[in-house]
Amino acid sequence: MYKVLSLIILFSLITKNAVSESKFYIIAKVNNEIITNYDVETESNYLKLLNPNLNQLDENKIIEIAKNSLINEVIKKKQLKKIFNFEQNQPVINKIFNDFYTNLGFLNEKDFKQVLKSKKSYTVLEIKEKIKIDFLWNKLIYNLHNKQIKIDKKKTFKQNQK
């Protein structure tokens, strides 16, 4: 009797895992990095947290935006790793992160973490990684193009006085 019960339990666990594994599927493959439907759903929840107006869009449109966001992130990260020491700790990221959740209306990191968990979004570490990618990408673009930008300080000063 014990063996039969054990086999039934084992079989049910195996089939349950097999069924639950089929819930995840590949949406895209970018630079040998796989993006799954779970990744897109998490990104979608994150984007909705950043911009609640996204909730007014059709769900398929939100999914498309999230997928494109993830694809862009993978491409940016690959390029950034060629130029920057990506693993190096950057203290400015913590400052940007604090400003980030404060601008979203959260009083502290703990409240922000709770909402992230309830919305099935990213962890704080994952968000800091996203912030690092954006920060380094903006830094790269600035470094590449800052010499091309010319600001007429006299004209700007006159416009600010009006």
Residue ranges of each PLM-predicted region?
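Short, low-structural-confidence N-terminal segments
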Residues: 1-68, 118, 142, 162
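Peptidyl-prolyl cis-trans isomerase
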Residues: 57-162
